A protein has these predicted regions:
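PRPP-associated nucleotide enzymes
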Residues: 1-234
């Protein structure tokens, strides 16, 4: 939040192997984490009295699946993203996987247009950072790419990519149960408290979600908190 005004929905829990101050070193994303991120997304929007009229999706399986799930949760329609799309919640699984020419159109805030990027690689600079980020990673495998993990000891890995279309994947994702523990509830309470407090700040210090003009920050390598030598991936 200090660097970009974006809100982080799912910091890596303390003690997560390979994590670095809330950021995943190696992440194997799954539908349960996606479902949890969606719940926190809805909580933040409600806390800030934001009601996007629709969800805007980039092409590709990961983007469409998350966008359709978000639309179902928020009770709004889902439409393809276009530079002139106007108000709505723009959903990307990972902006690093979106065509650069589309990402470039998000450089400036637009009235009523919010940007949620589920995953963001914190070891490589990117031209735009989401107003909402689910998690930060150095290496990540999406829930629908687990067949690419090469580990003969893993009997739980699928043989290939999912055959279902994004609409069916979104329905399955939304069916994942949420079983929060005390740590989850404390994290969510802290997130919503930060969102409300920041919303009451002077305009320049408010969350990126509440900015109707100006530019979105880049995703910079590093952090304002102390840590080891900065990582930079090629």
């Amino acid at each position: 939040f200090v660097i970009s005004g974006g809100l982080l929905l799912l910091p890596a829990p303390p003690g997560t192997p390979g994590s670095d101050r809330g950021r995943w070193e190696r992440s194997e994303d799954d539908e349960t984490r996606c479902r949890q991120a969606l719940a926190r997304l809805a909580g933040v929007l409600s806390a800030l009295a934001l009601a996007p009229p629709r969800v805007l999706s980039f092409p590709d399986r990961e983007n469409e699946t998350l966008a359709l799930a978000a639309a179902e949760l928020l009770g709004v329609p889902c439409a393809p993203f276009a530079p002139s799309a106007g108000p709505g919640l723009v959903v990307a699984y990972d902006l690093a996987r979106v065509l650069p020419e589309l990402v470039a159109t998000l450089h400036h805030h637009a009235p009523g247009q919010l940007l949620w990027a589920h995953a963001a690689r914190w070891t490589r600079e990117q031209p735009v950072v989401g107003d909402l980020l689910s998690f930060l990673y150095r290496r990540n495998v999406s829930p629908w790419e687990r067949h690419l993990i090469l580990d003969p000891r893993r009997t739980d890995l699928p043989a290939g990519p999912p055959a279902e279309p994004p609409a069916e994947l979104a329905t399955r994702l939304m069916g994942r149960p949420l079983v929060p523990d005390e740590a989850d509830e404390a994290d969510e309470a802290a997130l919503l408290g930060l969102a409300r407090a920041a919303a009451a700040a002077p305009p320049a210090g408010r969350p990126a979600l509440l900015q109707a003009d100006g530019v979105r920050e880049r995703l910079w390598i590093g952090s304002p908190v102390p840590h080891g030598p900065p990582h930079r991936d090629p």
